[in-house]
């Protein structure tokens, strides 16, 4: 997410855009570059995306717990969500239930992907950004309180954020 116009577009300096493109090209794939326009727009896009990601992990953990406690097999519930309107990258790759998605951190002892403590930081940035532009971030304000508690829980500290599953379900750490 780049706070600059794409080379050849907008009012930006083509020389600057070309330079940015060249430098970033050494670090990643151009098809993964999102030229967001003016300075700061790339950061706004990143904060918006992280706002969604942080709330999704919490919502997925709560929804999976609800379904499992109602007797639904965790893998079946994941398949239902994957093939329905609840499908998301986070549900498919960061599902917080151990054993549901083999490559997910939860299936690998919550081996670090993105720390629980960082979830608090990122959702906090989202709350601040929303308020700055006149949006009432009601969902994120509720979510950040849960994330703060999980970030202080020894079962979640310095583990992937999907370890919030342990906190929400009060599961003893093995």
Language model features with spans:
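Hydrophobic alpha-helical segments
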Residues: 170-174
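Hydrophobic aliphatic residues
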Residues: 24-28, 81, 168
């Amino acid at each position: 997410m780049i706070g600059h116009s794409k080379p050849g577009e907008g009012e930006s300096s083509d020389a600057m855009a070309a330079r940015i493109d060249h430098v970033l090209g050494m670090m990643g794939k151009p098809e993964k570059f999102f030229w967001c326009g003016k300075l700061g727009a790339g950061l706004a896009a990143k904060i918006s995306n992280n706002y969604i990601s942080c709330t999704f992990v919490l919502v997925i953990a709560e929804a999976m717990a609800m379904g499992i406690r109602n007797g639904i097999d965790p893998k079946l519930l994941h398949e239902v969500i994957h093939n329905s309107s609840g499908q998301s990258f986070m549900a498919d790759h960061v599902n917080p239930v151990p054993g549901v998605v083999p490559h997910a951190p939860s299936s690998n002892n919550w081996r670090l992907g993105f720390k629980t403590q960082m979830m608090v930081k990122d959702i906090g940035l989202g709350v601040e950004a929303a308020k700055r532009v006149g949006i009432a971030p009601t969902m994120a304000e509720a979510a950040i309180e849960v994330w703060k508690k999980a970030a202080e829980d020894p079962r979640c500290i310095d583990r992937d954020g999907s370890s919030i599953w342990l906190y929400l379900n009060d599961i003893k750490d093995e």
